[in-house]
Structures are given as structure tokens and as C-alpha cells.
């Protein structure tokens, strides 16, 4: 099976920035191609200031694109739990991501950059207003897609929506099964594919 990590990371980035309107503050792909940086962290980190809670929220991103949605959900949440609930200081993967984040922070607006750095400084009072969250992309084979032209587009759309509604309860239960992950804010994108292997091949042909 070809590695589609980059495809998932790119799709996650597009969805988070276009739909959730959150900028990506740490991108995994440039770090992986930098020989001076050994990176095995999240599939990107995104940030926004939440006016409701008055906190700066960092979203750790995870993407999994499998043929089976159950395995994709489980692996995605397992990875996310390791990042968000990992305890200890200094040498955890979350802390290593934070160090890379601080070192590679690069915004066009120097005032925005300075403000964000205040939230990342443990010695600054703003650090108490930093909140960790999660965002996931789960891609899977959707059986509602026909293998021929026997269904019209509206029919396929309705079937997929109904199945996604069924998946919602499964998502909630999987988060509860991975407590304390269920205590965190976690955004989930479900992306149905006609065939994930075809998607892999097409993506690989473009890079």
C-alpha cells in the first residue's frame, strides 16, 4: 500500500483553512524534507483565538485514509489521544511540536506573531489561556457510490448523508472509550471516497 500521509495532510489543511477558517501554524511537510529536523509529530497544527472562551486554541491535526472507516476512526483517535493527553514535560511529542512551533513561527504580521508567542511562553500569564484541541480527517471507502451508472447524484448524496448520521454516534462512543480524549474539543471531517486506492494512485501521479 502506498503511503498517502501527504495526501491526508494536504486535504486536512485545505478543509481546516477553508471551512473552519483556521490558519496552519505548523506544517509537517516542510519539516519532513528538512534534513536538519527529525519530525514525527502531528499532521499539522492550527490555531485560533476563541472569543467565547477568551483562549488561544491550538488544534493538533491527524489524518487517516483507509478503506475501512472503523479502523480509520480508531487509529486517528488513538494517535490524537497520544498527543493531547501525553503527560510529562520537556520530551513529550507535544512539547517537541511546541518547540518546533515556537522556532518556526513565521507570520507576515509581526504584532500577531508577538501576541501568539505570549500564549506559548510558560512564564507569561497568557500561557494560562492556551487550550489544546484536536482536528481529524477520516477518509474511507463509501459503499453508496455505485460501480456503474445505476444511481443518480441526488440518490447517492442522500445515502451518504444518512450513513454519516449513523457514524456520528460511533464517533462519540470512540471518544468516550478513549477518555480523557472526550474532554477535549475535537473536530472531525468524514470524507467518503469511491475508492481510496484510486485516490492514492491519482495523488501520487500528481506529485
Question: What are the roles of these predicted feature ranges?
Answer:
Residues 17-25, 49-56:
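Secondary-structure boundary elements
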Residues 37-41:
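A short, glycine/Asx- and small/polar-enriched loop/turn
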Residues 55-83:
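Active-site ExK catalytic segment of metal-dependent nucleases
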Residues 151-207:
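Extended, charged low-complexity segments
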Amino acid at each position: 500500500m502506498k503511503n498517502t500521509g501527504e495526501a491526508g495532510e494536504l486535504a486536512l489543511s485545505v478543509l481546516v483553512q477553508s471551512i473552519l477558517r483556521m490558519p496552519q501554524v505548523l506544517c509537517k511537510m516542510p519539516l519532513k524534507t528538512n534534513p536538519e529536523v527529525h519530525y514525527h509529530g502531528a499532521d499539522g497544527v492550527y490555531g485560533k483565538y476563541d472569543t467565547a472562551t477568551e483562549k488561544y486554541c491550538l488544534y493538533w491535526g491527524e489524518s487517516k485514509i483507509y478503506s475501512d472507516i472503523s479502523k480509520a476512526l480508531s487509529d486517528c483517535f488513538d494517535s490524537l489521544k497520544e498527543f493531547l493527553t501525553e503527560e510529562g514535560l520537556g520530551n513529550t511529542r507535544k512539547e517537541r511540536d511546541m518547540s518546533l512551533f515556537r522556532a518556526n513561527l513565521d507570520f507576515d504580521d509581526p504584532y500577531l506573531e508577538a501576541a501568539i508567542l505570549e500564549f506559548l511562553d510558560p512564564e507569561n500569564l497568557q500561557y494560562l489561556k492556551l487550550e489544546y484541541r484536536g482536528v481529524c480527517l477520516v477518509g474511507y471507502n463509501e459503499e453508496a457510490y455505485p460501480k456503474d451508472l445505476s444511481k443518480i447524484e441526488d440518490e447517492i448524496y442522500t445515502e451518504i448523508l444518512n450513513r454519516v448520521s449513523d457514524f456520528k454516534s460511533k464517533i462519540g462512543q470512540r471518544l468516550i472509550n478513549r477518555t480523557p480524549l472526550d474532554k477535549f474539543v475535537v473536530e472531525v471531517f468524514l470524507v467518503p471516497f469511491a475508492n481510496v486506492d484510486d485516490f492514492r494512485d491519482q495523488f501520487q501521479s500528481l506529485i
